[in-house]
Amino acid sequence: MVDASLIDHLDELRRRLMIAGGAWLLGALICYAFSQQLFQAVSAPLRQALPEGSSLVFIHATEPFFTYIKLSAMAGLLLSLPVIFWQLWAFVAPGLYPSEKRLALPFVLASSGCFGAGAWFGFGYVFPLVFRFLVSYGTEVGNISAMLSMGAYLSLSCRLLLAFGLVFELPILIFFLTRMGIVDHFWLARRRRTALLLAFVVGAVLTPPDIVSQLAIAGPFVVLYEVSIVVARVGAKRSRDAFSEENSAE
C-alpha cells in the first residue's frame, strides 16, 4: 500500500508542475506574437559576423515555422522563470525552518536574475566572439562561403544560452546545498582542481568543439565557483543561526 504522505507529495508536485508548465506555455504564446522580431534580435551576432554576400537561409519549407516555435519556447521559458522558481520554492518550503522560509522572495529574484544575467552575458559578450571566430575559421579558405541555416543557428544559440544561464545558477545551488549541510566551503575549496576539470568538461559538452566556446563557458564557471565558496561560508553561518533559532523556539 502506498503511503498517504507520498501520494500527497506527488499530488503537490503535479500541481506545481502544472502551474509552472502553464506559465511557460503562456509566456511562449506571448513571445510567438513577436517571434520574427525576436529572431532578428537573436541572430544579430551571427549576421554581424557573416562576410558580405552571406546570409541566413532555411533549407526545408517548414524550417522557419519550427524555428519560430522553438524561439518562442525559449523566450517563454525566460519570461516565466520567476513563476517556475516560485513553484519550486513552494514545493520545498514545508521542509524548511521558519527563518529559511523568509528567503522565498530573495530566492526567486536571485535565481531569475542569475539565469538572466548568464543569458545576457552569453548573448552580449560571448556570442559575438564565438560566431566571429567560427565564421572566420570556416571562410578563411578563399573558395568557401558561409550559408548558415536559421534552424541550426537557433539550436546552437539555445544550447549556449541555457549553458550560460545554468552556470550562473551555481552560487544559488551551492548556497542551498550548504544550508542543507551537504557541502561546506572547506569541501569546495579542497576540490578546486576537480571543479576546473569539470568546467572544461561542461564546456565541451554544451558548446561547439572549439577552444573559444569552451573557454567562454569554463572561464565564468571557475569565477563563479570561487564566488560559490564565499557564498557557502555565508550559507553555513546562516544555517547555524537558523538551527539555533529553531531550538530556542522549542
Swiss-Prot record:
Record flagged with keyword Cell membrane: yes
GO cellular component: TAT protein transport complex
Stretches that traverse the bilayer: 19-39, 73-93, 107-127, 133-153, 160-180, 211-231
GO MF terms held by the record: proton motive force dependent protein transmembrane transporter activity
Membrane-protein topology: Multi-pass membrane protein
Domain of life: Bacteria
Keyword Cell inner membrane attached: yes
Subcellular location: Cell inner membrane
Pfam families xrefs: TatC (PF00902)
InterPro entries, per database record: TatC
One GO BP: protein transport by the Tat complex
Complexes and interactors: The Tat system comprises two distinct complexes: a TatABC complex, containing multiple copies of TatA, TatB and TatC subunits, and a separate TatA complex, containing only TatA subunits. Substrates initially bind to the TatABC complex, which probably triggers association of the separate TatA complex to form the active translocon.
NCBIfam families: tatC
Role played: Part of the twin-arginine translocation (Tat) system that transports large folded proteins containing a characteristic twin-arginine motif in their signal peptide across membranes. Together with TatB, TatC is part of a receptor directly interacting with Tat signal peptides.
Name assigned to this protein: Sec-independent protein translocase protein TatC
